[in-house]
Each structure stands twice: as C-alpha cells, then as structure tokens.
C-alpha cells in the first residue's frame, strides 16, 4: 500500500526507448571526435597567437627597419610604453627623460623609439627636416599626416577636410589660401574691438568674483574670455556658455581614451588593419559629435544669412569666394569649428600657464606691472600695437610658450616618406616627430633651460648670460607650411588679457602650484588652475 501510494505521487517522466549497444557506441565515438575537434581548434588558435606574438617581438627587435633606434624594450615591441605615458598623464616629461637618457654617451642618439612604429627626435635639424620642405621635397618626398592617428580621426570626426586634417599638400595650400585673409595685419586691426570688448568683460568678471572671495581661480574667467573672443571672431557672435562646458568635457573624454588610441596607432601600420582601427575609434561616439555638437551648423548658416558690418574670420573668408578661391559650405563649417576649438584650447592653455609662472615669480610679476604702469595711464589706453612693443610683457609670454608649448601633443607627428633625418634613415610609413617640449628645454640650445627667465628674450646681446641661446629652436606655433595660421590672433589676445589683468589687480600666489608637477599632459594639457589673491 505504501509503495503504491509513493508510486502514484511520483513525478511524471517521459518515456524513452532503450538504445542498443551499437547506437550507444556510435554516439560515444561522435562526442569524442567533436571534443577532439574543439580542443584541436582551440590549441591551433592558441598556437597561432603565440607564434604571432613571438614573431612580432622578434621582428620588432631584430628585423624592423627601425630596430637600431634605441629605446625601452617595452617600447620596441609594443605600444605599452606610450599607453603608460598618456595614462599617467606625463607624456611630455616621459619623452624628455627618454631623450636625456639615450642622448648621452655612449648612445648619443638624436632619436628614440616610442613604439614599434613611432620615433621621436629632439634636434633643430630634425625639426627643420620634418616641417620645412627641403631636399626630400625636391625629390617628391613629403612628410605628411597621412597614416597618423590625427588624420584617421579627422576623417571620422570632422564633417569635411580642414587645415588640421588635410594630408595632401595641395589641398592644405588651397584651404590656407582661402583662410589667410582673415589673419592679415589689416584684419587683426579690424578685429581688435572684439578682443577689447571681451577683455573688458573679463576684468569686470574678476572684479565681481573678488568681492565674494578674495581668492579667485583666474582660469575659468580667462578661458571664458578667450572662448568668447575666438567664437565671436569665427561666427560673428559668442557661443553659448554651455557649449564651452561641453567642449571641455569632450576634451577630457578624448584624453581619457588616449591609451586606446595609442594601441590603434600601431594597428595603422599593420596591412589591412586600418579599417579595424577606424571602427574602434567609432566605438567612442562622443568623438563623432565634437564639431556638430559644440558648434551647430545652424549657427553657421545663420551667420551667412546675417548681413552686418562686424569684421570677423568669416567676413574675410567669404570675400575670398568673390575672388574665386572656393570653399564648400561643409569645408567652411569644418574650418570655422577648427578655428574655435584649436584657437581656444591653445590660447587658454598658454594664458593659464603664463599667469601661473608670473604668480610663482613675484619679481617678474612686479617688473611687468611696473612696465605697464609706466606706459599707460589706464587700461582704455591699451591697444595692440604698443602692447606688442613691450619687452617684459612679450618676454613673459614667449618664455611661457617655451616652457609649456600648448600644441606639443600628437599634432606635430608626421609620416616619413623614407628619407634621412638628422643623419638617421627613417623608412617610409614610420611615424616621426621632433619633440617641441624636449627641444625647447634642451641645454644644447638654452641657458638655464628649465627656468622661467623672461629677460632671455630682450637682454641677450653679446656677453650676456643668454647670448648663446639658439632662439631658432623656439617654435611653439610650429614652422613651415603648417605653421599655425592664427598665431598673431593668439598673441594679440594674450597680450591684451595679461596686460589688463596685471595692470588692474595686485595679484598674489596663494599656493605652491607648479605646472611641471601638477598639470596633466597627454595629448593636451588638462586640469590646470590659477588661484590668486586679488
């Protein structure tokens, strides 16, 4: 009875007919073969990967055309050295240390290896060879951006080719010719009222902030002023404040993914891998939206439709169309966006660096203030021409640009056409650069290279301490055909902002803050501040 009861409540089980012995053996053999096939495929894949890894290491160490270029072992066989440098946000300093190590005896090398496909030079000779068309250009060999990470990202991010991303020399020359009228001496004079307007607004902004708290971070005030100046010159009106915040967030994101981008840079040199590299960049959607999200095309169209007398970049550029120098609407948007983003970031960075250096060197700050007070009775008297003739003001700016070049990141990289650079043959396709940060701090070219010495720019005659400085090695705006087209605008804006700030306020440092120690640098300088007692 008990067994019957238990059986009646047993769970239902489907019926399966019994297998005979031959069927069982056949299934067992098949499962065994499937398992062997799976494990065999896995073993083959692992073996292939191991062989590929070993061969890659062996090739990069012994067979690569740049195998003799000295550098850390990890840099010779992988992108990990560069990935580490940008990840820890010490790219400039780390490259400089490499040059100091391998530039000494017995190596005495003008070039170091940063990755399996990238090398860095630290000599004026290399800088001229890479950026100035010379003997190699006469042979039809040009250093271009084709194959660089910047060019690859430019194709994906920007709506059309611009001055930064153009890889063909003729195309770059056409765009430069179309944009050049916006940066002539006459254009600068006509644009000055826009700079004056936003500089005066900066002074009022700092005055208001100092009423609430005597310690003021000057960086956001200076950054906003430069953003307003550059965007006003580019679009005929300042862009919204939230667009500046959006750009700063995107810049931070870009630097955060820089280690991944370094790995992709190595992929660019592998045949057939460029498509994969571009697809990987596409996985970072924020980078796609940079020009159109920060600088909407609707705002550009609105500027085209508006007829006014304000003199800005677009006024001069549109005049070129009348002379037959053509740019498409997409090229106009791409280049206008470029002028705002690059013009803003480099100028804002240099402003903050200069003010920080002045705060750290109160004697220099006092000398500058005395110079300004001796030449002007008020800030309303300050105009671009007399400011450009002040030795201490211009010395402070040039010295800041020497110590902290704003555009030293990957933007100076080029692809070798296969030629000699400073006595070293660099094969075609290798990524090359002349490291601006290292050159401008090299004892080979500068007396007291790591010190802030504004007087080196005006007190440098025969017999002086700085007489032997090689000032031709100072190229913060690059050199050659790709020299920054907006350098005069940037310098004019910096002179005006610094002069009015130093003239108006008695500034004093409130912390021991050093750019060398505290400011992150990967592809760009980020996270800087400038706290001062006002």
UniProtKB/Swiss-Prot annotation:
Protein name: Cytochrome P450 monooxygenase btcB
Residues carrying a glycan: 20, 335, 413, 431
Family: Belongs to the cytochrome P450 family.
Pathway stated in the Swiss-Prot or TrEMBL entry: Secondary metabolite biosynthesis; terpenoid biosynthesis
Intracellular or extracellular location(s): Membrane
Pfam families: p450 (PF00067)
Any one Gene Ontology BP term: terpenoid biosynthetic process
Amino acids binding heme: 484
Positions of transmembrane segments: 41-61
Gene (name only): btcB
Function statement: Cytochrome P4590 monooxygenase part of the gene cluster that mediates the biosynthesis of betaestacins. The bifunctional terpene synthase btcA converts isopentenyl diphosphate (IPP) and dimethylallyl diphosphate (DMAPP) into the sesterterpene betaestacin I. The C-terminal prenyltransferase (PT) domain of btcA catalyzes formation of GFPP, whereas the N-terminal terpene cyclase (TC) domain catalyzes the cyclization of GFPP into betaestacin I.
Enzyme Commission number: 1.-.-.-
GO CC annotation terms, alphabetical: membrane
Main location: membrane
Reported cofactor(s): heme
Membrane topology annotation: Single-pass membrane protein
Domain of life of the source: Eukaryota
């Amino acid at each position: 009875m008990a067994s019957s009861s238990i059986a009646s409540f047993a769970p239902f089980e489907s019926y399966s007919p019994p297998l005979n012995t031959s069927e069982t053996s056949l299934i067992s053999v098949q499962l065994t073969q499937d398992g062997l096939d799976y494990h065999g495929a896995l073993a083959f894949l692992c073996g292939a990967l191991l062989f590929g890894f070993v061969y890659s290491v062996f090739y990069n160490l012994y067979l690569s055309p740049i195998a003799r270029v000295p550098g850390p072992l990890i840099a010779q066989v992988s992108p990990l050295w560069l990935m580490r440098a940008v990840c820890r946000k010490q790219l400039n300093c780390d490259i400089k240390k490499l040059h100091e190590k391998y530039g000494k005896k017995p190596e005495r090398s003008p070039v170091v290896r940063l990755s399996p496909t990238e090398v860095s030079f630290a000599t004026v000779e290399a800088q001229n060879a890479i950026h100035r068309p010379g003997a190699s250009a006469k042979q039809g060999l040009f250093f271009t951006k084709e194959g660089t990470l910047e060019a690859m990202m430019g194709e994906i991010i920007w709506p059309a080719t611009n001055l930064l991303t153009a890889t063909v020399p003729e195309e770059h020359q056409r765009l430069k010719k179309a944009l050049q009228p916006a940066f002539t001496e006459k254009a600068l004079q006509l644009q000055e009222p826009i700079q004056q307007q936003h500089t005066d607004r900066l002074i009022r902004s700092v005055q208001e902030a100092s009423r609430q708290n005597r310690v003021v971070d000057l960086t956001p005030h200076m950054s906003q002023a430069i953003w307003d100046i550059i965007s006003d010159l580019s679009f005929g009106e300042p862009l919204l404040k939230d667009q500046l915040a959006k750009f700063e967030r995107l810049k931070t994101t870009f630097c955060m993914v820089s280690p991944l981008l370094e790995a992709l840079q190595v992929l660019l040199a592998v045949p057939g891998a460029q498509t994969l590299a571009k697809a990987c960049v596409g996985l970072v959607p924020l980078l796609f939206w940079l020009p159109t999200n920060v600088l909407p095309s609707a705002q550009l169209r609105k500027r085209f439709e508006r007829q006014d007398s304000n003199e800005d970049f677009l006024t001069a550029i549109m005049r070129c169309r009348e002379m037959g120098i053509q740019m498409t609407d997409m090229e106009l948007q791409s280049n206008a966006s470029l002028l705002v983003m690059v013009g803003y970031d480099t100028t804002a960075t240099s402003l903050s660096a200069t003010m920080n250096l002045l705060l750290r060197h109160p004697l220099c700050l006092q000398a500058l203030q005395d110079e300004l007070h001796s030449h002007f009775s008020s800030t309303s008297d300050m105009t671009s021409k007399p400011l450009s003739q002040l030795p201490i003001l211009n010395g402070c700016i040039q010295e800041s640009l020497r110590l902290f070049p704003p555009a030293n990141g990957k933007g100076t990289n080029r692809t070798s056409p296969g030629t000699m650079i400073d006595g070293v043959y660099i094969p075609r396709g290798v990524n090359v650069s002349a490291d601006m940060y290292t050159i401008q701090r090299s004892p080979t070219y500068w007396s007291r290279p790591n010190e802030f010495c504004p007087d080196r720019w005006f007190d440098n005659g025969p017999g002086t301490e700085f007489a032997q400085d090689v000032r031709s090695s100072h190229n913060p705006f690059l050199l050659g055909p790709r020299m920054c087209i907006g350098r005069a605008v940037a310098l004019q804006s910096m002179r005006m902002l610094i002069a009015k700030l130093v003239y108006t306020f008695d500034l004093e440092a409130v912390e021991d803050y050093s750019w060398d120690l505290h400011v992150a640098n990967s592809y760009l300088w980020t996270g800087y501040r400038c706290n001062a007692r006002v």
